Amino acid sequence: MKINRQRFESLMHELIDENPLACQGILSILRIEYTDQVPSLAVSLEEPPRLLINLDFLIEHTTQEIHVKSVLLHEFLHVLLNHTEQFKQMDRATNIALDAIINHIIHRSQGEDYSEFFRIYYQGQKGYASLLRPDPHGTTTDDRTLERLHLDLLSGSVVVDDLLDLVREIRKEEPAPLQLAPGLPG
């Protein structure tokens, strides 16, 4: 999708006008930075959080305006859910767990059009990373725990304790922890 700073900011303002969650999220962010220092979009783990935007990511991976709004809403939800205050460091396992919860919140609250971006972007993910993809039409796996997590994420029945259990399970599979800023690539 062809997008520049002006178009991005226009879409951000549209999202804020359309969505109370986005409006609350942006009120907590004092600064927006365009940078290639993050692979996608991210909110910094500091007070107050900064919204970091890699326009090249949006150009390469979004095909519709609603995709840009979905990614923005995803970042705003990190702020609204206090992830920027609760977590001062982010490893891959925690990032996957938090992003999976957020992507499914977007699916449940905004519908399939909004969650389409995450289904497309994460379509090739396997194992716990497949939880990043809200797929209401079913995800098939031989792993019963993973299948149950998919269903629980879709229904909204995953709570913080489940999220922390998920992080512990993901860490068991990780050979070494990766330090990542929160953001989409997970």
Which functions belong to the PLM regions below?
Residues 1-69, 75-186:
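Short, functionally important secondary-structure microenvironments
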